[in-house]
Amino acid sequence: NDTYPAACKLALIDALGPLAESTKKLAKAFHDLADKHINDVTIGRTQLQDAVPMTYGQEFHAFATLLKSDLAAFDRVVPLLAQLNLGATAIGTGICADLRFRQSATKHLAQITGLPVTAAPDPVAAMTDMGAYVSTSAAVKNLAVHLKKAADDLRLLNSGPRCGFNDLNV
């Protein structure tokens, strides 16, 4: 009851690393496109209806901003995931475990992983709390929604050339 959740949390932190790196690269690419197209005017649309003028730079900047907010969410969940109930045993009381194990194990894990691993301040609460998993799921889902939005917008703007918008050539 303490080992599997600790392993799962560490695995999630490990999985977030490459995802965050890829997201940073994409955010930078959108920022670069925003700078390149800061003065290229297009029409903004709402519900596929023409609305008001905007620049492609503004659109690409918006994509980058959303990705940066997702990266900030990743940064917020890592410390939650790094709080481990390792050594809390069956229900969080630590019964039958050496009193030094929790601190020793988390200190060792922090050293060998380079992660900000700490012992959960209340192991009984940590045993039942799913908040770190829920927050991580929400952060990843939000990233997925933002990526889908960008992909859908780019696909639509690239539609054509004869009967679609044909605003962009990706």
Regions found by a protein language model. Give the residues of each.
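Conserved, well-structured ligand/cofactor-binding cores
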Residues: 1-170
